[in-house]
């Protein structure tokens, strides 16, 4: 488990705020939340369902309008208007009073309660109409705010509907449809063409492609094939190859697949993703911690100021009623509701948008930190490179053809399970197409050096330079091998009887997208990018040169990677570590933000990383950083708007320039503006290009 890193950050256990229900206390089979509670801890429902607060507000407005209109009707008793205003008070203040009582009983304080106090104060002064107007505008603003916030929340809740409610399971030789909650480990389920996959599992029968975009964000369907051993128990398998594994909520292609269930519905990747996204909403960012601290001192100061203003009549020649009215207007103006919602609304929208793009951001802290990065450290293998060796060069010697060289090499290496041998066979067959391969005999491995065998009655040796150190390898061949190794290749010589017939080179090649991704990151304002690897320095520098990364550090053990990240952190302050989330976990823990790639298939990566790129897609990184920088900018805008409105309204109400009506309109207006501003994050585009340095926009 990771612990806090900077800025008083909270542990990665994602605790839920005291006094509020967990957003995922009752997450069902696919993570459905029975009660999703917003940051303030309130979700309103009642006799009119989810629209109850809005309908109550409209009833309040109707009663207010009727009371105000009837007050101008000649001969109409004042009691009629008063009764209508009281009705307006009841419906306009119902939810505010309910929330305040619940919060106070838990030992907390509800800022919105200040509005209720102001309305009661207006009633005491006999200004029933203004008090009712205050409650109407306030309740209407709240209802619209909840509606707007629900749009962001629905983006998260949409994830819960990805997995189908039922599955077609094979039991006792026949197919039967059951609820996914009833699936057990080892069940065999049938996935029909173009249907959603109901559970995480491995393919037992059938070949086809699966659209994994809902989980990983991959735009191209992924080919699937059956596992080699269908009887094996894969439930505890840590590393299952992508071509064998399927996820709940993804969409099958045109083929019928039979899948063995390896995770119960409640533990599926989509279910855990929804839980983590819901919990992430509760994580407070540095800005939110600041606003909370600000409110802690600001609210008491406002209450003291309001109390003092009530006695202004002792100093100024005015009646008590006017002083009290001014104090209530200041109370309305100074209530920091917009400030309270400014950061949570942006965090919710940012986390929801990221989840739709296949990126899990675990709360406000990593969201903001990601937008402030100055440097990124990358693990090489599997992050900047493909993670597996590929046949890169086939160099025939002494008059032999490339085809004949490959036939001999494949014949020998296809009997080995060594990763380099597998790469030679795969790459060679791709080059040869359908040519038949002879059988090798007398195959014998030479540990650490190579392999020997017979093909067509001739003795074949394939291996590194050490295998041939006694053979007086010609100088020109040695030079070719050394040139390849300087370029980061692993080279092997092929000898047939007494003649060297070729050189084969292999390399963990850079990802095709790596170079462009690094350029995008540089355009986003990442000042320094380094590559960390356990490979030798020569290989590290060769890969770095190909992808355009300036700093490469090789020959690193896991503890050396930790030291490298710590050193980078001291010089650049805000550093991310990008890796697989497993082997790189120690280095990630020491970085400002730990980012794991390909996390959909790794439980460990989902738990250890601050940010998880669900698909094995490096191009998701610029999207996540661009989104985070956009979110950081919106949070700053919201702070200026919310604090600016308060800063303007307080002196205006103290001087009597603005009354309660305009004050509450400005107050509620600013709240809706910051929420609407935050919702812009939901429309953030994957390919949205931004040149931003340190979180500030610059002209492209």
Feature map (PLM): residue ranges:
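Flexible metal-binding regulatory segments at protein termini and peripheral loops
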Residues: 1-78, 158, 171-174, 221-223, ...
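Juxtamembrane coupling segments of multi-pass membrane pumps/enzymes
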Residues: 18, 110, 135-193, 221-231, ...
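Transmembrane helix-loop-helix hairpins at the membrane interface
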Residues: 42-166, 293, 394
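Helix-interface capping motifs at the ends of transmembrane segments in multi-pass membrane proteins
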Residues: 62-90, 102-111, 116-131, 296-334, ...
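Membrane-embedded alpha-helical bundles of multi-pass transporters
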Residues: 69-74, 99-100, 105, 117, ...
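Juxtamembrane helix-loop transition segments at the membrane interface in multi-pass membrane proteins
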Residues: 101-109, 144-162, 345-364, 679-694
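Conserved cytosolic catalytic loops of P-type ATPases
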Residues: 158-267, 365-409, 454
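Cytosolic catalytic headpiece
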Residues: 364-583, 587-593, 626-629, 688-700
């Amino acid at each position: 488990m990771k612990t806090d890193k900077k800025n008083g950050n909270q542990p990665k256990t994602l605790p839920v705020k005291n006094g509020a229900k967990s957003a995922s206390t009752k997450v069902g089979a696919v993570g459905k939340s029975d009660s999703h509670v917003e940051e303030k801890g309130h979700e309103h429902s009642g006799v009119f369902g989810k629209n109850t607060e809005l309908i109550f507000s409209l009833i309040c407005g109707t009663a207010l309008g009727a009371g105000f209109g009837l007050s101008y009707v000649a001969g109409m008793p004042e009691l009629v208007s008063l009764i209508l205003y009281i009705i307006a008070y009841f419906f306009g203040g119902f939810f505010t009073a309910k929330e305040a009582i619940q919060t106070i009983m838990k030992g907390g304080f509800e800022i919105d309660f200040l509005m209720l106090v102001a309305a009661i104060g207006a009633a005491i002064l006999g200004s029933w109409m203004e008090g009712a107007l205050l409650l109407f505008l306030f309740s209407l603003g709240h209802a619209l705010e909840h509606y707007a916030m629900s749009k962001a929340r629905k983006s998260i809740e949409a994830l819960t509907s990805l997995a189908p409610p039922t599955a077609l399971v094979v039991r006792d030789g026949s197919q039967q449809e059951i609820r996914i909650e009833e699936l057990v480990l080892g069940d065999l389920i049938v996935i029909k063409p173009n249907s959603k996959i109901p559970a995480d599992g491995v393919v037992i029968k059938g070949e086809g492609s699966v659209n994994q975009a809902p989980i990983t964000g991959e735009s191209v369907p992924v080919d699937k094939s059956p596992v080699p051993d269908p009887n094996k128990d894969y439930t505890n398998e840590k590393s299952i190859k992508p071509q064998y594994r399927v996820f709940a909520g993804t969409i099958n292609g045109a083929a019928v697949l039979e899948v063995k269930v390896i995770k119960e519905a409640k533990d599926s990747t989509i279910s855990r993703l929804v839980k983590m996204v819901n919990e992430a909403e509760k994580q407070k960012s540095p800005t939110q911690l600041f606003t909370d601290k600000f409110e802690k001192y600001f609210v008491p100061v406002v209450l003291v100021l309001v109390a003092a203003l009530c006695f202004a009549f002792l100093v100024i020649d005015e009646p008590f009623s006017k002083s009290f009215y001014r104090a209530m207007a200041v109370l309305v103006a100074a209530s920091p509701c917009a400030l309270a919602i400014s950061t949570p609304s942006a965090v919710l929208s940012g986390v929801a948008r990221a989840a739709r793009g296949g990126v899990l951001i675990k709360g406000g802290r990593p969201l903001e930190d990601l937008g402030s990065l100055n440097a990124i450290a990358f693990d090489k293998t599997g992050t900047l490179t493909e993670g597996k060796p590929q046949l890169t060069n086939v160099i025939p010697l002494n008059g032999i053809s490339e085809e004949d060289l490959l036939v001999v090499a494949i014949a020998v290496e296809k009997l080995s399970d060594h990763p380099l041998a597998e790469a030679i066979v795969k790459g060679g067959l791709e080059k040869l197409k359908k040519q038949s391969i002879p059988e090798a005999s007398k195959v014998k491995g030479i540990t650490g050096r190579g392999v020997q065998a017979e093909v067509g009655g001739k003795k074949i040796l394939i291996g590194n330079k050490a295998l041939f150190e006694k053979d007086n390898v010609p100088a020109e061949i040695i030079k070719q091998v050394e040139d390849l190794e300087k370029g980061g290749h692993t080279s092997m010589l092929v000898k047939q009887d007494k003649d060297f017939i070729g050189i084969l080179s292999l390399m963990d090649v850079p990802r095709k997208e790596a170079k462009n991704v690094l350029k995008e990151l540089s355009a986003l304002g990442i000042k320094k990018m380094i590559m960390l690897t356990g490979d030798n320095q020569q290989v590290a520098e060769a890969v770095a040169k190909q992808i355009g990364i300036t700093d490469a550090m090789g020959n690193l053990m896991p503890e050396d990677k930790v030291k490298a990240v710590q050193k980078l952190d001291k010089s650049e302050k805000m550093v991310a570590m990008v890796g697989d989330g497993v082997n790189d976990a120690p280095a990630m823990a020491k970085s400002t933000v730990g980012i794991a790639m390909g996390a959909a298939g790794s439980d460990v990566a989902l738990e250890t990383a601050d940010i998880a790129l669900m698909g094995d897609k490096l191009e998701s990184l610029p999207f996540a950083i661009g989104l985070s920088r956009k979110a950081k900018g919106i949070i700053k805008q919201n702070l200026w708007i919310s604090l600016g409105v308060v800063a303007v309204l307080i002196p205006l109400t103290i001087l009597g320039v603005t009354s309660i009506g305009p004050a509450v309109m400005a107050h509620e207006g600013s709240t809706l503006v910051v929420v609407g501003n935050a919702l812009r994050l939901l429309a953030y585009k994957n390919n949205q290009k931004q040149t931003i340095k340190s979180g500030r926009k610059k002209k492209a």
